[in-house]
Amino acid sequence: MSVFIDKNTKVMVQGITGSTALFHTKQMLDYGTKIVAGVTPGKGGQVVEGVPVFNTVEEAKNETGATVSVIYVPAPFAADSILEAADADLDMVICITEHIPVLDMVKVKRYLQGRKTRLVGPNCPGVITADECKIGIMPGYIHKKGHVGVVSRSGTLTYEAVHQLTEEGIGQTTAVGIGGDPVNGTNFIDVLKAFNEDDETKAVVMIGEIGGTAEEEAAEWIKANMTKPVVGFIGGQTAPPGKRMGHAGAIISGGKGTAEEKIKTLNSCGVKTAATPSEIGSTLIEAAKEAGIYELLLTVNK
């Protein structure tokens, strides 16, 4: 089993005729992702990389049966693209776009309440189920099938963690980038719940960063509900208060959201934390050995 997407997932690309979308569409197709449609208003009838282009999400869904969309639309128009995907009742929309205005996302989040469409992102690397389906911008080759779930606010730290695991012979089920913006769709707890219920996932790596309280809330949820070992890492440990570190959501304000606070809460809830990015893999191995599942996690031929 996998989380959110698998080899049978039919995907549409919103904004497919843009240069960034074209580049990543080719990468996703090469990985084996079933991209069945593209959407660019006014460009319906074209074919790019063998993928038919439609004017609307509704039309693309009806013609191809796509259930998931990935958005590479420029920031000023991205919120409308998410709303269009939700109106078409897609199962999931993965928004890669960065710099969407916060107020736009507040409206989107409100609009999605009570609807079936799950939003992942924005400002995220996407979702990948190893060796099956890649939706987003992550480097596919570092991901290998196995039993560790990865959930992260940071794209590049996801790649770092996955690469370390693969190098150690430890494969992954699904890696989910939830994005670095202050207002997003899917949060840590949503993904942790999915991993907890997934038979194939035996352990989880959770990567957070300064700003907000998402990691603290996740830690409390892990303590109360999680039946599998979780290890963590918090980015931004050297950040001074009030200084944004990369992501829009990565800022310490009002004394809240510090790395120190987050690490303390995670540790108190039984989550082992890596001190540096280079120790994420070894921290997971340590936790797996303690849980008696290390041998089970060795699925990649080194």
From Swiss-Prot:
EC primary class: ligase
Give me the residues that bind substrate, please. 159
Superkingdom of the source? Bacteria
Identify the catalytic residues. 247
Keyword terms of this UniProt record: Ligase, Nucleotide-binding, Tricarboxylic acid cycle
A GO cellular component annotated for this chain's UniProt record is:
succinate-CoA ligase complex (ADP-forming)
Q: Which positions does UniProt annotate for CoA binding?
A: 17-20, 43, 96-98
Q: Kindly give the Pfam families that the UniProt entry links to this protein.
A: CoA_binding, Ligase_CoA
Q: Does the keyword Transferase apply?
A: no
Database matches in SMART domains = CoA_binding
GO biological process terms, semicolon-separated: tricarboxylic acid cycle
InterPro entries this protein is in?
Cit_synth/succinyl-CoA_lig_AS, Citrt_syn/SCS-alpha_CS, CoA-bd, CoA_lig_alpha, NAD(P)-bd_dom_sf, SUCC_ACL_C, Succinyl-CoA_synth-like
Per UniProt, what is one GO molecular function of this protein? succinate-CoA ligase (GDP-forming) activity
| The enzyme's E.C. designation | 6.2.1.5
Q: In which pathway does it act?
A: Carbohydrate metabolism; tricarboxylic acid cycle; succinate from succinyl-CoA (ligase route): step 1/1
Keyword rRNA-binding belongs to the record:
no
What is this enzyme's catalytic activity, as reactions? succinate + ATP + CoA = succinyl-CoA + ADP + phosphate; GTP + succinate + CoA = succinyl-CoA + GDP + phosphate
**Role summary:** Succinyl-CoA synthetase functions in the citric acid cycle (TCA), coupling the hydrolysis of succinyl-CoA to the synthesis of either ATP or GTP and thus represents the only step of substrate-level phosphorylation in the TCA. The alpha subunit of the enzyme binds the substrates coenzyme A and phosphate, while succinate binding and nucleotide specificity is provided by the beta subunit.
Q: Identify its protein family.
A: Belongs to the succinate/malate CoA ligase alpha subunit family.
How would you summarize the oligomeric state and partners of this protein?
A: Heterotetramer of two alpha and two beta subunits.
> What protein name does the entry list?
Succinate--CoA ligase [ADP-forming] subunit alpha
Gene name? sucD
